[in-house]
Amino acid sequence: MSWLTPELIEILITVGKAVVILLVVVTCGAFMSMGERRLLGLFQGRYGPNRVGWGGSLQLVADMIKMFFKEDWVPNFTDKVIFTLAPMIAFTSMLIAFAIVPITPTWGVADLNIGILFFLMMAGLAVYAVLFAGWASNNKYSLLGAVRASAQTVSYEVFIGLSLMGVVAQAGSFNMRDIVDSQEHLWNVIPQFFGFITFAIAGVAVCHRHPFDQPEAEQELADGYHIEYSGMKFGLFFVGEYIGIVTVSALMVTLFFGGWHGPFLPPFVWFALKTGFFMMMFILIRASLPRPRYDQVMAFGWKVCLPITLLNLLATAAVILYNA
């Protein structure tokens, strides 16, 4: 066929890879909700979901059926357009951010020269989902959760970018593949240990995960900005949170733990094992740490994490200048 040119074939292959990768990310996010409940049960000395299917294996299917058939109610007192837009942003922002992550030397969605900046942009966009949900719900608890989210995001996105500048300076590029290639002999977690620690803390905060789940604190805000949502709109928020965990875990692997590099096993297996480990760490943190007060969260970001990040950046610059 004359219209099937090599350029078109390459475009179709690229689109096919992108669809497969993003579908796998969404599936991992959905299955992580099931895995989290089982692991929390293990950590707390109980069984977790074990009634639907063999050993609870079909619990995710039951949850999906329940979500699909729940009434998707939109209260009359809400701003309906923004109320509907918020869960869409929550679901898509971190999913699109995963597009810059190279899974293997040949598998990835987008190879951008501004990869890290693109992630920071999408992480900043994710907070608009919370702000829109809190404002459009016309509920005081939702609004309080949204205000908390905006303040927390401003605090922690200041140093989530600075924590990555040491990695960028060492690799000499914002491109994710270049950063992975620069770790072929030494992972960045060793020279950039403090950068990794602050990025991991900020990553948990970006995902609004415990102990940084102040915007949706159940005991204080009755589930915060989620309070007026039901049905699939609530489901989009729910799955979007787990997609954020998958994305941040993959970025930790890519930026600090060598990406797909590793001995003996294929690159994809190494990437999956490393990412799965950090996804489990998110669950372990939820099971083991208490939720601090809101003022303690803010003070920790500005008084502890930001100075550490700046000192790490200065030390990295000094080492690079000395070696030059």
Swiss-Prot record:
<dbReference type="GO" id="GO:0009060">
    <property type="term" value="P:aerobic respiration"/>
</dbReference>
<feature type="transmembrane region" description="Helical">
    <location>
        <begin position="304"/>
        <end position="324"/>
    </location>
</feature>
<keyword id="KW-0874">Quinone</keyword>
<keyword id="KW-1133">Transmembrane helix</keyword>
<comment type="subunit">
    <text>NDH-1 is composed of 13 different subunits. Subunits NuoA, H, J, K, L, M, N constitute the membrane sector of the complex.</text>
</comment>
<dbReference type="Pfam" id="PF00146">
    <property type="entry name" value="NADHdh"/>
</dbReference>
<comment type="similarity">
    <text>Belongs to the complex I subunit 1 family.</text>
</comment>
<keyword id="KW-0520">NAD</keyword>
<comment type="function">
    <text>NDH-1 shuttles electrons from NADH, via FMN and iron-sulfur (Fe-S) centers, to quinones in the respiratory chain. The immediate electron acceptor for the enzyme in this species is believed to be ubiquinone. Couples the redox reaction to proton translocation (for every two electrons transferred, four hydrogen ions are translocated across the cytoplasmic membrane), and thus conserves the redox energy in a proton gradient. This subunit may bind ubiquinone.</text>
</comment>
<feature type="transmembrane region" description="Helical">
    <location>
        <begin position="114"/>
        <end position="134"/>
    </location>
</feature>
<feature type="transmembrane region" description="Helical">
    <location>
        <begin position="186"/>
        <end position="206"/>
    </location>
</feature>
<protein>
    <recommendedName>
        <fullName>NADH-quinone oxidoreductase subunit H</fullName>
        <ecNumber>7.1.1.-</ecNumber>
    </recommendedName>
</protein>
<feature type="transmembrane region" description="Helical">
    <location>
        <begin position="81"/>
        <end position="101"/>
    </location>
</feature>
<feature type="transmembrane region" description="Helical">
    <location>
        <begin position="237"/>
        <end position="257"/>
    </location>
</feature>
<keyword id="KW-0812">Transmembrane</keyword>
<keyword id="KW-1278">Translocase</keyword>
<feature type="transmembrane region" description="Helical">
    <location>
        <begin position="265"/>
        <end position="285"/>
    </location>
</feature>
<feature type="transmembrane region" description="Helical">
    <location>
        <begin position="154"/>
        <end position="174"/>
    </location>
</feature>
<keyword id="KW-0997">Cell inner membrane</keyword>
<keyword id="KW-0472">Membrane</keyword>
<keyword id="KW-0830">Ubiquinone</keyword>
<dbReference type="InterPro" id="IPR018086">
    <property type="entry name" value="NADH_UbQ_OxRdtase_su1_CS"/>
</dbReference>
<keyword id="KW-1003">Cell membrane</keyword>
<dbReference type="GO" id="GO:0005886">
    <property type="term" value="C:plasma membrane"/>
</dbReference>
<dbReference type="GO" id="GO:0016655">
    <property type="term" value="F:oxidoreductase activity, acting on NAD(P)H, quinone or similar compound as acceptor"/>
</dbReference>
<dbReference type="GO" id="GO:0003954">
    <property type="term" value="F:NADH dehydrogenase activity"/>
</dbReference>
<feature type="transmembrane region" description="Helical">
    <location>
        <begin position="11"/>
        <end position="31"/>
    </location>
</feature>
<dbReference type="GO" id="GO:0048038">
    <property type="term" value="F:quinone binding"/>
</dbReference>
<dbReference type="InterPro" id="IPR001694">
    <property type="entry name" value="NADH_UbQ_OxRdtase_su1/FPO"/>
</dbReference>
